[in-house]
């Protein structure tokens, strides 16, 4: 009895370690959203021009997730995590030292390389190390690391950038990553590659219409979200006319609400993943459509950001659950594809927001994002009725 108890504690501790790593990786992915104005000022550029960095980062991840995963499919996972953290840390040092926007983009590409591998293996590792029957909860814990990156990492990174310069934000992330690396070395066991799949897995996965439908849903809904979210900081200051401090508070609210979404999914995700995801997409649609009307009031924007954060966390978790349920025999390949497709959506959304801001008006980003959100809602209803599946069923 004691052994089992200790075993469960150790299992959860390892999952928590991965959650901390997720926090670090998502902090660096999200933090430029809160630093666009500062970086633009530093390099004498427009905010929308700097925003293209978000698209470059996301599309590098999208392009490299599957190739890197296949290249490292036989590498022991603990060793792989250590190596990618070394690349991650070195790239942040370069971000700190960057003397031009081009160098900053190059450093972000290095981070994106590490990101591409990390997110293709993390979800399956969390499920693998979780106590029996706690797979959805393990995923929820990883997602909590993601949410904390938004509720703590992004606002703190923005505050550091405001008071000490945006370079110090990236340097601080590098320090945090180094500490996390030491923890990984200490706590994680040897993790031989299991069920990672190979290039031979791709035709099999592509012949699963339910899985392909989930991938399509993912890219559409993520595009909708990032069309507006990528430029929420300049939107709050330049369109709504509120202070930089309120922009920080709004990002804090949105991230904190993500934790609520994580808790909701942890309790209901095993049984009601499909219904939760469709409801969350509908909620996202409403939030995007109301973004500009809500911009006349700090309270209205605050309430909207809470529902927005809840919706996106449930959507992200739900998509992962579906992918893992539909590809239990090739989890790493399936998640590498998912990570790549998710980042195609991030890059597409950031690019659409960039073009809307440059050639139309930044005030329209919510309305434009609502269009793919509506398409995603209809598609989710169709596919979830046709292919209902939960994580615990592990149905192909």
Curated annotation (Swiss-Prot):
Matches recorded under CDD domains: MFS_NepI_like
Coiled coil spans: none
Database matches in InterPro entries: MFS, MFS_dom, MFS_Efflux_Transporters, MFS_trans_sf, Sugar_effux_transptr_put
Highest taxon in the source lineage: Bacteria
Alphabetical UniProt keywords: Cell inner membrane, Cell membrane, Membrane, Sugar transport, Transmembrane, Transmembrane helix, Transport
GO molecular function: carbohydrate transmembrane transporter activity
Cellular component annotations (GO), alphabetically ordered: plasma membrane
SUPFAM superfamilies: MFS general substrate transporter (SSF103473)
Residues spanning the membrane: 15-35, 50-70, 81-101, 103-123, 136-156, 170-190, 209-229, 246-266, 275-295, 299-319, 333-353, 364-384
PROSITE patterns registered for this protein in UniProt: MFS (PS50850)
Cell location: Cell inner membrane
Membrane topology: Multi-pass membrane protein
Keyword Transmembrane: yes
Physiological role: Involved in the efflux of sugars. The physiological role may be the reduction of the intracellular concentration of toxic sugars or sugar metabolites.
Entries under PANTHER family matching the protein: PURINE EFFLUX PUMP PBUE (PTHR43124), SUGAR EFFLUX TRANSPORTER (PTHR43124:SF4)
HAMAP family registered for this protein in UniProt: MFS_SotB
Family: Belongs to the major facilitator superfamily. SotB (TC 2.A.1.2) family.
Protein name as it appears in the record: Probable sugar efflux transporter
Annotated source species: Escherichia coli O17:K52:H18 (strain UMN026 / ExPEC)
């Amino acid at each position: 009895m004691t052994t089992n108890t200790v075993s469960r504690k150790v299992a959860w501790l390892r999952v928590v370690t991965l959650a901390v790593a997720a926090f670090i990786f998502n902090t660096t992915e999200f933090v430029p959203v809160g630093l666009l104005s500062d970086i633009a000022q530093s390099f004498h550029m427009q905010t929308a021009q700097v925003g293209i960095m978000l698209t470059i980062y996301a599309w590098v991840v999208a392009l490299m997730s599957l190739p890197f995963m296949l290249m490292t499919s036989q590498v022991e996972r603990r060793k792989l995590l250590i190596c990618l953290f070394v690349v991650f840390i070195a790239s942040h040092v370069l971000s700190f030292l960057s003397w031009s926007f081009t160098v900053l983009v190059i450093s972000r590409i290095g981070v994106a390389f590490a990101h591409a591998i990390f997110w293709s293996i993390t979800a399956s590792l969390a499920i693998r190390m979780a106590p029996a029957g706690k797979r959805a909860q393990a995923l929820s814990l990883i997602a909590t690391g993601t949410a904390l990156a938004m509720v703590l990492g992004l606002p703190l990174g923005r505050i550091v950038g405001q008071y000490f310069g945006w370079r110090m934000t990236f340097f601080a992330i590098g320090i945090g990553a180094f500490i996390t690396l030491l923890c990984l070395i200490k706590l994680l066991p040897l993790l031989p590659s299991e069920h990672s799949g190979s290039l031979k897995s791709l035709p099999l996965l592509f012949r699963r219409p339910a899985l392909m439908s989930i991938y399509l849903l993912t890219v559409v809904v993520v595009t909708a979200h990032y069309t507006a979210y990528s430029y929420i900081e300049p939107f709050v200051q330049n369109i709504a006319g509120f202070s930089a401090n309120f922009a920080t508070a709004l990002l804090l609210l949105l991230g904190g609400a993500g934790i609520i979404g994580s808790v909701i999914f942890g309790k209901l995700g095993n049984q009601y993943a499909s219904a939760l995801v469709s409801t969350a997409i509908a909620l996202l649609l409403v939030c995007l459509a109301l973004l500009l009307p809500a911009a006349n009031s700090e309270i209205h924007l605050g309430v909207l950001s809470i529902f927005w954060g809840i919706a996106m966390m449930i959507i992200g978790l739900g998509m992962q659950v579906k992918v893992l349920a539909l590809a239990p025999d090739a989890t790493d390949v399936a998640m590498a594809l998912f990570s790549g497709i998710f980042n195609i959506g991030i890059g597409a959304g950031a690019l659409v927001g960039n073009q809307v801001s440059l050639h139309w008006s930044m005030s329209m980003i919510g309305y434009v994002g609502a269009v793919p959100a509506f398409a995603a809602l209809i598609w989710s209803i169709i596919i979830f009725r046709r292919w209902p599946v939960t994580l615990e069923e592990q149905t192909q």
